[in-house]
Amino acid sequence: MSFKIDDYIKGDAFEYLPRMPDKCADLVFTSCPDLSQTEFDKTSDGIRSYQEFQKKATKEFARIVKTDGFVVICQTDRRVNGSILSNHMHYAKCLEEEGMHLKDYKIVVRNEVGKRDMYYFTFQHMLVYTYKGTITRKGDWLRDIYVDKQNKVLNQSVWSQDFCDYVIENLTNDGALVVDPFAGVGPVLWSAKRLGRHYWGAELEEKFYNDEFKQFRTTLPV
């Protein structure tokens, strides 16, 4: 399967990522599928398989990002089997094993603060990794907590365009290539397109694939 920029495809990211050139992306900005959104169950074997899936993804991210580019993973942890499945710590470990460094870290509040939930946290961990990239620390980027007004499409939370713009504008320049391999309805890709960046992304599930970004052009209130 071929790879071309400015493309949002319906398909398996792992069929395309290996075809992407080394060090081609300025920004990989994504939220990998949650355990509940995969084929893996909550058994010890299932969780190990899920973590291998996460590791496989981060190895590709670390390969395709430029030396001065960034990998941004924004994901929540989960309560599973009476303990915490610390997704953000596992992603950090995997990226650091690839030689990347944690350049910045923020909390992204995705629900109202203080909401009570048995299984889901109300915030996401935003990890910003790079090999040698630099960030201009000024203005809004200095905040360490970002309150995002997210919407739901079925069981998937959708980042606001304000949040996507915030990350892309602070970490890339015009003409940069922004990649979201687990694009969902495509908020990162739509933001990149509007901001004059190149983009590439994939979504496996028909129920989330937002062909030609139609939901952003019409009904999705993000």
Label for each model-derived stretch:
Residues E212-F213:
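Conserved SAM-binding loop
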